[in-house]
């Protein structure tokens, strides 16, 4: 297939995280053009809006008829497809001030409920990411988030995208994750994270990712090497289960199949798309 690849992966977008993200090798990237890799420094934040901008840029400059969007950040994909409201523009100085304000709240969800019951009703009390984003809007605009979204409605994605997901038998998936974890550790995962953890702020977004956060616990002597491996495998399995459930419940017209079936379906679809 004559195509290019857009990486929708919340870890591969960072520079210097190569092992933990299982980033494509330089050789693989030389043969096939990849977008959205090595775009951010460790202390910068990624979000759905950034990926949407990068995806639109990639679609504009790609010389191929097909752009494959590949990755596990399904929440971002759903946000991009359904549309995103324009977020308020705030300076770095304001971001620090807002973060400080939010960190002083004893119960962020209760506070959100008090200033905007409408938006709070739509967010689960444990969904810290969305609570945080809503509070950022409030502190940046001094407007309840629900009113802000009313004034800045979502704009659905303008391009049609076909969706495919892999269905892998549980024991095979566990075996694959186990082998991948062993390979990562053997390739120098801990050393990679140690170099970054000593260099960047401890609250940097990538340090919360699976494979990274467990390595940090190992470096802080809270886990043995065996426990580190087991924790990465266990947490990756849980994530895979969540991703699978999310994909099946949140996307319409999702083609699910084995590696062979999905490959065949993508090839058939790409041929008809090019003809069309």
Swiss-Prot record:
Catalysed reactions, semicolon-separated: adenosine(37) in tRNA + dimethylallyl diphosphate = N(6)-dimethylallyladenosine(37) in tRNA + diphosphate
- Say if the entry is tagged with keyword Endoplasmic reticulum: no
**Which residue ranges does the record annotate as region Interaction with substrate tRNA?**
9-12
Q: Which UniProt keywords apply?
A: ATP-binding, Magnesium, Nucleotide-binding, Transferase, tRNA processing
- What are the residue positions of the site described as Interaction with substrate tRNA? 73
What cofactor is needed? Mg(2+)
Asked if the record carries the keyword Nuclease, the reply is no
Gene Ontology MF, one: tRNA dimethylallyltransferase activity
Question: What biological-process terms (Gene Ontology) are attached?
Answer: tRNA modification
EC number annotated for this UniProt entry: 2.5.1.75
Q: Which top-rank group of organisms is this from?
A: Bacteria
Which Pfam families does the record match to this protein? IPPT (PF01715)
Q: How does it assemble?
A: Monomer.
Family recorded in the similarity comment: Belongs to the IPP transferase family.
Return the NCBIfam families for the record. Answer: miaA
- Role noted for this protein: Catalyzes the transfer of a dimethylallyl group onto the adenine at position 37 in tRNAs that read codons beginning with uridine, leading to the formation of N6-(dimethylallyl)adenosine (i(6)A).
What name has this protein been given in UniProt?
tRNA dimethylallyltransferase
Species of origin reads Helicobacter pylori (strain HPAG1)
Upper classification of the source organism reads:
Bacteria, Pseudomonadati, Campylobacterota, Epsilonproteobacteria, Campylobacterales
- The protein's gene is named miaA
């Amino acid at each position: 297939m004559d195509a290019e690849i857009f990486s929708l992966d919340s870890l591969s977008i960072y520079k210097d995280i190569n092992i933990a993200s299982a980033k494509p090798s330089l050789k693989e990237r030389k043969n096939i053009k990849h977008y959205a890799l090595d775009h951010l420094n460790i202390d910068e934040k990624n979000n759905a809006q950034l990926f949407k901008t990068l995806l639109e840029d990639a679609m504009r400059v790609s010389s191929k008829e097909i752009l494959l969007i590949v990755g596990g950040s399904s929440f971002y994909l759903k946000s991009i497809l359904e549309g995103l409201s324009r977020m308020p523009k705030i300076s770095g100085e304001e971001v620090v001030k807002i973060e400080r304000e939010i960190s002083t709240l004893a119960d962020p969800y209760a506070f959100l409920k008090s200033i905007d019951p409408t938006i709070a009703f739509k967010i689960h009390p444990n969904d810290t990411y969305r609570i945080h984003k809503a509070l950022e809007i409030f502190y940046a605009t001094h407007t309840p988030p629900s009113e802000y979204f009313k004034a800045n409605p979502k704009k659905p994605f303008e391009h049609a995208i076909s969706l495919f997901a892999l269905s892998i038998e549980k024991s095979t998936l566990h075996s694959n994750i186990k082998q991948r974890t062993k390979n990562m550790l053997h390739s120098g995962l801990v050393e990679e994270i140690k170099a970054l953890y000593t260099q960047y702020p401890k609250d940097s977004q990538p340090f919360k990712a699976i494979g990274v956060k467990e390595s940090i616990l190992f470096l802080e002597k809270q886990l043995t090497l065996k426990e580190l491996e087991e924790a990465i495998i266990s947490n990756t399995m849980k994530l895979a289960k969540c991703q699978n459930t999310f994909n099946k419940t949140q996307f319409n017209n999702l083609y699910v199949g084995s590696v062979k079936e999905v490959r065949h379906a993508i090839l058939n679809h790409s041929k008809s798309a090019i003809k069309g």
